[in-house]
Amino acid sequence: MKKLIKAFICACVLAGLLTADGFACAEAGSGELSVHVFSFGKADSYLITTEGSAVLIDCGESENGKEIVQYLKEKGFSKLDCLILTHFDKDHVGGAAKVLKSIQVQRVLQSNSPKDSKQMEKYLKALDGTDIEAETVSEVLTFTIGDAEFTVYPPQRDNYEKDPSNNSSLATAVRFGENSFLFTGDAESARLAEIVSLELGTFDLLQIPHHGEWDMLLVNLLRMTDPSYALITSSEEEPEDMRTMQLLQQESVEALLAREGELDIVSDGRTVAVSRAGDTGEALAPAA
């Protein structure tokens, strides 16, 4: 029912934007925003680009860094405007060292829960080889890159008794014209409760936290965000929880599984199109 209401509202809005001659007024956002979802199995990396600008959220495992760098260069990006590391688990920070050594990075945002691991050590060593001072996000941070607005929401505690790394995940909202996307890292129960309490509103796309693992608070998160698409990073060996998939079906949310191949999610500021290699994509009405 909510999706039908969205479609109706969108139709009304678009009708209101038409001139007497039947032509639409100016676009909600100039150009396009693209989210490239790497297919790294149970590891996360998302490249968000607008015209001439690039932001990377997480870097997958150590062996994924080379592929990220290669993709950036193939697409003509010699620098990153910002690197956001949601937390320091190896499947999120692993490729960061390679990225920092190979690509000019202007800004690094990180979580507040460091880990004693070789991946963390390599990341810090690579960071020392640059002139960047990484920012540990402790307050809500909003900034604009190109025509996209990014808001980063930090964990609300300095430490968590259970799953401290995952529950320290940064959450990032990306807004472009009338479209919006929410990335939640590996948030588990304690962090999910915090994100839900923020009452962030609706999003066109929600990244399901922690590779699609089940948590009762996913019900609250989905009903708050009311997405049309839900993105999950998992693997054939460790697939998403069936209870999570059943919930998405129940809420009429289309699941996008990165393990089935890389995804490109493109917004023109009003509609969103999702495609895999060889696909043309299907337009999606923006959230109301």
What residue spans do the PLM features occupy?
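Repetitive helical segments and hydrophobic/amphipathic motifs
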Residues: 11-15
